[in-house]
A protein has these predicted regions:
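Compact, glycine-rich, soluble single-domain proteins
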Residues: 1-105
Length: 105
């Protein structure tokens, strides 16, 4: 999986973002992982809806447009949940729970 960096206004926010842009990498996502480091994230593309089945920890999710505009932030999503589709979303960032607030998003 390719690693990306996430910037906002030229400032580095997240230094290791996995790019899940194929069926299998999107399907697996964060399932069955024990944890996620705070400065890491997973970018699901294309994606407009997520679930947290098979996950062992809460996450923050950020729905993005094709132009990387933030459309919706869902904080502290617990395991075993399905979240609604976000209109016009093309990508979803999955982060450690609490990271969106720490980044000022």
């Amino acid at each position: 999986m390719a690693l990306l960096k996430v910037y906002k206004n030229g400032k580095l926010l997240l230094d290791e973002c996995e790019n899940a842009n194929h069926f299998f990498t999107r399907f697996m996502g964060l399932m069955y992982r024990r944890s996620m480091e705070e400065k890491h994230c997973l970018l699901l593309t294309p994606c407009n809806e997520i679930h947290t089945f098979g996950m062992k920890f809460d996450i923050d999710t950020i729905a993005l447009s094709k132009d990387n505009e933030i459309l919706f932030i869902d904080r502290a999503v617990p395991p075993k949940k399905v979240r609604k589709k976000v209109k016009d979303a093309y990508k979803v960032l999955e982060l450690c729970s609490g990271t969106a607030d720490k980044l000022g998003l």
